[in-house]
Amino acid sequence: MMSFLLGAILTLLWAPTAQAEVLLQPDFNAEKFSGLWYVVSMASDCRVFLGKKDHLSMSTRAIRPTEEGGLHVHMEFPGADGCNQVDAEYLKVGSEGHFRVPALGYLDVRIVDTDYSSFAVLYIYKELEGALSTMVQLYSRTQDVSPQALKSFQDFYPTLGLPKDMMVMLPQSDACNPESKEAP
């Protein structure tokens, strides 16, 4: 019993430390990061994600910086009834490129790697339905991801203990594709 308690305490002490070791994009620039992104791939240990990952499609993020140093993010997700939309405020936490999103249960969001013009890798530590989980998302400025972007993503997510079977490359969808919509 004592060894179980010791193991549980060590696990609790270790988890926040391991989570906090995820580095940020050096000299993150919110202005350069703003604009349209496609979510082209994800990896996660979230049980809800794992149950739905084979039925997901690419979604979009339209991002703009806020005066407070955060990000306003407009998300569009393909659904059975068309394109679902959600707006969220990414609140700055300490360093540039580090956020939390209380409305979505995102306790920790970090821009890990980006070249601003073609890709970004995001780390998300979240709570969903009472369970904590880790997610990594690969953003691309186009629906066709570059080899450099894919390599950065594939090199990063396993360092968090996420195996390949927890990753999905998302198929393209016209439901939320701004390029397929007619101009107003």
Swiss-Prot record:
Keywords: Disulfide bond, Secreted, Signal. GO terms for molecular function: small molecule binding. GO terms for cellular component: extracellular region. Residues 1-20 form the signal peptide. It is found in: Secreted. Belongs to the calycin superfamily. Lipocalin family. InterPro entries: Calycin (IPR012674), Lipocalin (IPR002345), Lipocalin_CS (IPR022272), Lipocln_cytosolic_FA-bd_dom (IPR000566). It comes from Homo sapiens. Disulfide bonds join 83-176. It comes from the Eukaryota. This is Lipocalin-15. The lineage of its organism: Eukaryota, Metazoa, Chordata, Craniata, Vertebrata. Its main location: secreted.
